[in-house]
Swiss-Prot record:
HAMAP family: Exonuc_7_L (MF_00378). Belongs to the XseA family. This is Exodeoxyribonuclease 7 large subunit. It catalyses: Exonucleolytic cleavage in either 5'- to 3'- or 3'- to 5'-direction to yield nucleoside 5'-phosphates. Heterooligomer composed of large and small subunits. Keywords: Cytoplasm, Exonuclease, Hydrolase, Nuclease.
Length: 443
């Protein structure tokens, strides 16, 4: 037998609490892709679901404060990518995920890859302002790396022609979209560095979707930009579009036209140096804010685990669980009572007076029909027997004898005369024949 003094004995509640803290503190944030099933959204506003693949599944909860930011309506069968933290639902001891963000799998995978590469390169210092090259105050030749048929090239050339038409330009045509685009752009940067004919490079294209701009989130391209000995201005998409190339480049311009303004002198009144410094400062501020945002997110995550709202979330989940259990119990009770009522109704129908009377009426009709059939058969038999008896009676009937030529003589009083001694002279006699009778007087 184990000695209690030598053992760390847990209660079930304490064990579950310890495991929950271990999962939440040690595992941190995880990214997970899977198919939604058992999705439910009770009145509390929280979401409960199961994420599964072909071999396993895990229960998940997404509380109201987080699911408000989801831009689509989840449904069973959806493939999604979620950002979540591991936890344990203590009352049942169920391991679960607390989802913080959710995206459809396609967009989510790209965004996840973007975030992972961004964190990796930031940790290596590729975004650090100290590693960035300054732009030349008065460029002697500008290199443009973009598609030779894209609108971005013509936007850049239009701005340069308007602001500084004497500025020489070298175009390095390349693909800016598709699977091979990142390698081609990196090769163009390498070619420009080896020729060393330009003192600033503009790398960019027009706006597009996340997939369209994805080549600018390539790690090889990012490292090529960081290694360039010629300052590079990233001018990808619109102002709201941010790529890895924007973070690595020496300066980020919100549009290709803005990049052209950075490298050209406005001969009328614009101070190119001031504009460049403004953009450089803006780039540094964006990098600083990005770093602060990451640190704030980490601090917020720690604070959330200790915040009363976190406890409220867990208690709210317990209330939702109790609510669902109560609803199921009420439904089972209602179903049981309904079945009992149906059974009693069925028994009542079996013993119903109306049904009983109908059965008796049917039985009476059968008896009546049977009685009538019996009477008909009996009457037919009796008629047949009567006919036979009548036939026999006819054979011994006096009328039959009369028909054979015989006659019957009776006195006036109706006495049959069988001997001459039965009459005397003067008696009136009636002789019956087969057809009629004869009246005579004895003489």
């Amino acid at each position: 037998m184990l000695s209690k003094t030598n053992q760390n004995i847990f209660t079930v509640s304490r064990l579950n609490a310890e495991v929950r803290l271990l999962l939440e503190n040690e595992m941190g944030i995880v990214w997970l892709v899977g198919e939604i099933s058992n999705f439910s959204a009770p009145v509390s506003g929280h979401w409960y679901l199961t994420l599964k693949d072909s071999r396993a599944q895990v229960k998940c909860a997404m509380f109201r404060g987080n699911n408000r930011r989801v831009t689509f309506k989840p449904a069973n069968g959806n493939q999604v990518l979620v950002k979540a933290r591991l936890s344990l639902y203590e009352p049942r001891g169920d391991y679960q995920l607390i989802i913080e963000s959710m995206q459809p799998e396609g967009d989510g995978r790209l965004q996840q890859e973007f975030e992972e590469l961004k964190m990796k390169l930031a940790a290596e210092g590729l975004f650090a302002q100290t590693n960035k090259l300054p732009l030349p105050e008065h460029p002697k030749r500008v290199g443009i790396i973009t598609s030779k048929t894209g609108a971005a090239l013509y936007d850049i050339l239009d701005v340069l022609k308007r602001r500084d038409p004497s500025l020489p330009v070298v175009i390095y045509p390349t693909m800016v979209q598709g699977d091979d685009a990142a390698i081609q752009i990196a090769q163009a940067i390498g070619r420009a560095n080896s020729r060393n004919e330009c003192d600033v490079l503009i790398v960019g294209r027009g706006g597009g979707s996340l997939e369209d701009l994805w080549c600018f989130n390539n790690e090889i391209l990012a490292r090529t930009i960081a290694a360039s000995q010629i300052p590079i201005i990233s001018a990808v998409g619109h102002e709201v579009d941010m790529t890895i190339a924007d973070f690595v480049a020496d300066v980020r311009a919100p549009t290709p036209s803005a990049a052209a303004e950075l490298v050209s002198r406005d001969n009328s009144h614009k101070d190119q140096s001031l504009v460049a410094k403004q953009h450089k400062l803006a780039s540094a501020m964006r990098y600083y804010l990005s770093q602060q945002k990451q640190q704030s997110a980490q601090l917020l995550h720690r604070l959330e685990r200790q915040h009363p709202s976190y406890q409220l979330q867990r208690q709210s989940q317990q209330l939702d669980e109790l609510d669902m259990r109560l609803r199921r119990a009420m439904q089972r009770f209602i179903d049981t009572r309904q079945q009992a009522v149906e059974r009693k109704h069925h028994r009542l129908q079996l013993n119903s007076p109306v049904k009983h009377l109908a059965q008796q009426k049917s039985r009476l009709e059968r008896v009546e029909h049977k009685l009538l059939d019996t009477m008909d058969r009996k009457l037919l038999t009796m008629r047949h027997q009567l006919a036979i008896a009548a036939e026999k009676l006819d054979t011994v009937s006096p009328l039959a004898t009369l028909k054979r030529g015989y006659s019957i003589t009776q006195t006036e009083q109706g006495k049959v005369v069988t001997s001459a001694d039965d009459v005397k002279t003067g008696d009136l006699l009636v002789t019956r024949l087969a057809n009629g009778e004869i009246h005579s007087t004895v003489s």
